[in-house]
């Protein structure tokens, strides 16, 4: 008998699904089941149909809290479910029962696959909408779609109807990423290229993980003049490129590499770690007294910073721990001591004319986008090897935490343009899309006619909504790995291969030769 069922992440057991006492991510079976209850309650709320600002907030919070590596705390998950139930009763005199998620997991293979693509896409999109909302940006059309799509998940739908919703999820997510892009750039300025050190300076410091730039800004303000340095971790690295964040002299550098290495890298760390979003792994004894969560992130017995965003406990812990007695050198995954970031759409498009001329003159043969989520699977070395094998006359755009597989490499430059250009966080796929569209316009061709190939890694649900956006835009010949999602049925995969030439990654040498027609 199954104790849980979850197959939403790339590391799901046997690439079929986690169904025992705990998932591969570390969440217990009861936690997984409570998260399903939250989704079931949201589907009931969506079917009630009476949207308010409060229900919008709960939609985003509820979906976000069920993303992989966000919330391991049954108490807070059940509180969210109770809040949803109360609001559902408040907005409608008609009773709308919670949807039983077991019905979705037991559905026919293709219906389950398509509904899962929609649901996991909604989860990823909710994270982006949540961050935008924190900066005062909302889009009524994006908000409405959460209700439409969730309500549909609780109904009988044909595969054709569900496929339309899959692509519509991608369309709405494009608008949502544009919303977050506007929120971030209006608040913090357009990112500029910057070199970020990986050495941790001596003295007190705080490590900030996750994606929430607003939380980072508040922490920078509260630590000003206190003799505490701030270091980004994992997906927070692109913060260094934003003028309104990089202006703080105590935002010093980046700590460590991808999220999946945190249990090793945080071992006995003499400083606190603040998790603003995923990815949080089960916390180990050697640093558990130094971990803090905020926003939707929650873990049993770990102190949580509430909505008032008073980071005093984190600051006090930093002063108590004291940091390293001497400068503490760290390296990237390939031994590098610095990384670069800040090559978002404006920074890259400032050189669009040069890139076009370099392509036309044959100095740039091809452009790759190598990025997405990172993870622990050994097969993810594919992305490092692929980047290393790319010819010297090719450019690499990268983004999200998958960048750590290659971002400390020194691959040189072409005509003064670095061969590795970090566009930002996973939501900055929007920047990469804008760059591709601008280059296509400059060349007078379609995006699929550009010398451009996307080589994507996925792990969790934000990668799903980005993939759906790329499919909505009609992008072809995407390479996806390190495995095909367990929730993509053979028939759905066949459809994606036939209509979009989606290609599972194989080995870097073979794939590179196929892409470059060698």
Q: Model-predicted segments: where are they?
A:
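Long, compositionally biased, glycine/small-hydrophobic-enriched stretches that function as flexible linkers
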Residues: 2-203, 207, 227, 234-237, ...
